[in-house]
């Protein structure tokens, strides 16, 4: 299982309705790969890392984007406003929505951008149809599940179904390795309802931390993701009890995705290693971990 580098990228809001993504540039493939494999493959990108990079969230929203295809004037206008951020966002969006083995291409002047598919969660939208409500929700959940607050490499397991109800493949080996039940992710970025996260197991105790801070840290760890408490109070399991199939918030029921971690992704202040989620200080908490990171100054 190879590791990949996480890029810090701003998660942008899709502020208007969604028309079709342009037709596939490659024939569709049926893939039996697990989500872990799909998350690790492709161009050295770690699609398990949508890290917020501090840019103005509202200022980089999809203003005026009708999404009538990647060749439309509206898409070009949106993309060229912030091409670097838009390019990174599209890599994650296409990875979530489009099946593995397909790419989406956009050209602007002498520059050509190619984005690879991965999880294939929105098959209708991927093949040119307007995004259904279910597709909007599951792609939003995917983007939320890929958030990594610290922009570092973290291998995760994503469980759930596509918009059409097809389970994301997961092997017994994957479930046996990724034993930390992290969280549930749901919402709708496309219509402005927002993006929500809950913790599956209990939140981490005061001395522990993780690069995957959004679910297990609780509170306001990853704005604009809104932490809604325990998944168990808002979500229902699938028939097998493996993952949360739906979650309800503010009277709206969403298609959700569930994530799992490996035990080694949880760090404890005092283990002698100063982790990216820890900092210097005089205490024994991650934000002031003297034993691992020393005193400041």
Predicted regions and their residues:
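Bacterial N-terminal signal peptides that target proteins for export
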Residues: 1-8
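Bacterial lipoprotein signal-peptidase II cleavage site
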Residues: 19-25
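Long, compositionally biased low-complexity segments
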Residues: 68-266
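Cysteine-rich modules of extracellular adhesion/ECM and protease-associated proteins
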Residues: 267-297
